[in-house]
Amino acid sequence: MSVNRYTITNLSDYSNPKVVKKLLYSLDKLYHAAMWKGDGDSLAIYVDLKSAMHAKGVLTEKQMVYLKMWLDGYTQAEIGAKYKVGRDNISYRIDNAVKNMSLFLGN
């Protein structure tokens, strides 16, 4: 996903978990746009997402670990193999992490 002002404006509905997941997947691009291009909107979204990830009570420890690995580029199957759980379990926990973040940010 290309990060530009149009994309940011249309993807700033935090109450929608699908939007939050797309933004999380673009976290590095948001950081790059904020730091190297001076995009204040990207910076605000980056800070919001990072704050939600680290806010007490938003994510469980497993959700945090799996989400970070997914954001680092590991597939759900690779994460599952590392922790000896099924890919469906990883998918479930990542999706719930995104929903929790969406609820936190959407309020």
PLM-predicted stretches and their roles:
Residues 1-43:
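Charged, low-cysteine interdomain linkers and short loop/connector segments
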Residues 66, 78-81, 90:
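Hydrophobic positions on the alpha-helical face of helix-turn-helix-like DNA-binding modules
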Residues 83-106:
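DNA-recognition helix of helix-turn-helix
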Residues 56-74:
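Short amphipathic alpha helix immediately N-terminal
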Residues 33-61:
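Amphipathic alpha-helical segment used for protein-protein interaction
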Residues 14-17, 21, 99-107:
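Intrinsically disordered, low-complexity basic tails/linkers immediately adjacent to helix-turn-helix/homeobox/MYB/SANT
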